[in-house]
Amino acid sequence: MIHYVKGNLLESEAEALVNTVNTVGVMGKGIALQFKEAFPENFRVYKKACQKKEMRIGDMLIVKDSNLTSGPKLIVNFPTKTHWRLPSEYSYIKQGLQSLRKEIETRHISSIAIPPLGSHNGGLDWLRVKQMIEQSLSSIDCDIYLYEPSDAIVERMKTERVKLTPARAMLLLMFADMN
């Protein structure tokens, strides 16, 4: 059953927590940075897996870790990006959800907390990702706590401007010179 939640995923009572990651070993922003600070052993295992090129889109890296506030947890590192500089892709979410479903069933995970996969720093549309999660996981025997983006994050996503990168600036100059 899917439960829709707002708040801090790291405070969840769920048996497993999903951490959105890239495949290069960097947890520098967003929820990944929070996981890095809260679960240092998970970060060490994840970084080592990335250094060995074992972290791939569609594969979950599951680590048992604990801290003083949450106790023992299964941390499910879910790759939503190949590199921290690049955006997420819907195909990455789809592949990951298939793998996540298998892990939940194989490990008999009774409850899991999931953030808005690839929808903040990854740039994906939350409503589309939410629908993908519902289609993939709603029929399994597990309490799924789906943490929706806060209203402030949704508003920021709507109004966030496209950044002017050097490549975009060159393209604009090229069009300006054509006139």
Which residues make up each language-model segment?
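Macrodomain-like recognition of ADP-ribose-binding/processing modules
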Residues: 1-179
